Each structure stands twice: as C-alpha cells, then as structure tokens.
Amino acid sequence: MSSGTVLDSILDGVRADVAAREAVVDLATVKAAAKAAPKPLDVMAALREPGIAVIAEVKRASPSRGALAEISDPAELAKAYEDGGARIISVLTEGRRFNGSLDDLDSVRAAVSVPVLRKDFVISPYQIHEARAHGADLILLIVAALEQTALVSLLDRTESLGMTALVEVHTEEEADRALSAGASVIGVNARDLKTLEIDRDCFSRIAPGLPSGVIRIAESGVRGTADLLAYAGAGADAVLVGEGLVTSGDPRGAVADLVTAGTHPSCPKPAR
C-alpha cells in the first residue's frame, strides 16, 4: 500500500464518497436496512455447480480503458447475462473511475434470480452493511487495499451478515494474507491495481498454492473461450468477465459461448 499509486488515488475518492453517504444515511439506518433485506443467496452452491462458472460484470468504465460501454439499462444487461448462463452477476458500484452506483446494484438485484456481487473498493463496515441493504450476496475485498487487521475484520463482518467474501489477490504474499484471514473464495486479478499492468501468468503462479477447498476465481484478461480454457487448465473454478462482455455487441451470446466452453467435456475440471 505504497503512496502515489493508482489504487491509492481510487481509495482516496472512495473514502470521501463513503463519508458523504454516511453523512446522509447513518450506519444505524444502513444496518437496519441490511437486517430487513431478504436473506442472501447461496453463493458457494452456485460456484460449486459442475463446470467453470461465469461471473458476468456490469461495467461502464475502468481506470485503464476509460469509458467502455453506455449501459442505459443495467437490469436489461444483467438479465441477458443470466439468460446466457451466468451464475453470478457482478455490479461495479464505484462512481469516480468505473461510473457505477448503488442504483445499478438495486436495478440488477431486482432483475435477476442468481447471486449478485457488489464490486467496489471496500474499506469500511458501512459499505458491507450498505451492500447487504442493497441486495448483494457477495462482496469484493481487495487485499492490496487493506491492512491485515482490517481484512480480517471486514471478512468476518461480511460472513456475519450471511454474505460471501470474494477476496482479491495479485501476488503470492497477498494470497497468503487472504488465507490467513480465512478466505474461502479467492480471486486472482491479473491486473495490478497499483500500476494497472496486466500479468496473464499471475493466476497460474498463484492458484497451485491455494488449498483444494478454496474456490479459485480468475479475474481480468478473459477475452474469449481460449482464455477461459487456459484459466480452467490452471485450476480456475470460475472466471469473472467484464470488458469482454460489455464491448461484445451480444452480451447474452458472449456469456453463452463462455458457459458452453466451461461445461464442455473437454474443459479441464476444477480440482474440488
């Protein structure tokens, strides 16, 4: 967590935005809304179904590429993903760099019956209760963004609300920290959030060192079925795909192609 990185800049904005939201809706109110929300869906069951799971992302923009897609109706896009066979829908809710919002999360949650991931830079318990209040079943925790005590605390809080934590890593050291914190679902992001550079060998280096009981998700760099199959061969249980879907012109078909490849008899099987 060195100063001056892209990640640091994003986190500065997130802190300001969380403080602004909490000034309008306090933690007690958000906790009450989270408690009143429908029970979270079973994410682990979705990830353990046969084949490579596809997590399809509602993603308007990114720090590395800028604007990606004009998504006027996130619910319609999410439904197309679900119809294509996506097992989980990921929704970016960070506004400054990704043009996402909690309104997007609300729209998607109302439109689909599969689990929904809140994809954001979570640094505060407030965001976890907020995610639950808005219907998230799964929440992203980024190891590079958190000190170890905060990671452990936020992971525990996520699970105490019945949600599942997707704990994201980019290095072997971060993977060790994720395991020490008790992560049962680990995402290996090929993109270094501090520099935005892609390392496509990142997953194949880190995944073999993860215990067999841990769900392994490959993040970033999935451009099509060949990438899915490569990640499957390296031990992936699931792939998270955003840019490749929102820029495809046929999101339902693009998801369906990945799902077909991930469930084909020739596809390498996850080591569960």
Curated annotation (Swiss-Prot):
Q: Name one Pfam family in it.
A: IGPS
UniProt pathway annotation: Amino-acid biosynthesis; L-tryptophan biosynthesis; L-tryptophan from chorismate: step 4/5
Q: Which SUPFAM superfamilies match?
A: Ribulose-phoshate binding barrel
Keyword Zinc (UniProt)? no
Picking any one GO biological process from the record gives: L-tryptophan biosynthetic process
What are its E.C. numbers?
4.1.1.48
Reaction equation(s) it catalyzes = 1-(2-carboxyphenylamino)-1-deoxy-D-ribulose 5-phosphate + H(+) = (1S,2R)-1-C-(indol-3-yl)glycerol 3-phosphate + CO2 + H2O
Q: What would be an example GO MF term here? A: phosphoribosylanthranilate isomerase activity
Q: Kindly state which keywords UniProt assigns to this record, in alphabetical order.
A: Amino-acid biosynthesis, Aromatic amino acid biosynthesis, Decarboxylase, Lyase, Tryptophan biosynthesis
Q: Which family does it belong to?
A: Belongs to the TrpC family.
Task: Kindly provide the name given to this protein in its UniProt entry.
Answer: Indole-3-glycerol phosphate synthase
Organism of derivation: Mycobacteroides abscessus (strain ATCC 19977 / DSM 44196 / CCUG 20993 / CIP 104536 / JCM 13569 / NCTC 13031 / TMC 1543 / L948)
Gene coding for it? trpC
